[in-house]
Amino acid sequence: RDGYPLASNGCKFGCSGLGENNPTCNHVCEKKAGSDYGYCYAWTCYCEHVAEGTVLWGDSGTGPCRS
């Protein structure tokens, strides 16, 4: 499954430099979602093939962003 991983405050991880092979998103996706690939889409990191059990934005039980 694919999606937006969440920071500890319930917010998506921001990024700049839209597109593929974004170093920030690759790092976030590896560390927070167990994914080997991520990119910057709509100024937030999006991860593909996330690890099972990873909580993603929009999952049941996730609350609003507490920025």
Curated annotation (Swiss-Prot):
Disulfide bridge map: C11-C65, C15-C40, C25-C45, C29-C47
GO cellular component, one term: extracellular region
Keywords: Disulfide bond, Ion channel impairing toxin, Neurotoxin, Secreted, Toxin, Voltage-gated sodium channel impairing toxin
Molecular function GO terms recorded: sodium channel inhibitor activity; toxin activity
Tissue: Expressed by the venom gland.
Coiled-coil region(s): none
SUPFAM superfamilies attached to this UniProt entry: Scorpion toxin-like
Pfam families: Toxin_3
Compartment list: Secreted
Major localisation: secreted
Domain LCN-type CS-alpha/beta: 1-66
Chain's role: Alpha toxins bind voltage-independently at site-3 of sodium channels (Nav) and inhibit the inactivation of the activated channels, thereby blocking neuronal transmission. This toxin binds, in vitro, to sodium channels and inhibits the inactivation of the activated channels. Seems not toxic to mice, crickets and sweet-water shrimps.
Domain observations: Has the structural arrangement of an alpha-helix connected to antiparallel beta-sheets by disulfide bonds (CS-alpha/beta).
Family named by the database record: Belongs to the long (4 C-C) scorpion toxin superfamily. Sodium channel inhibitor family. Beta subfamily.
Protein name: Alpha-toxin Cn12
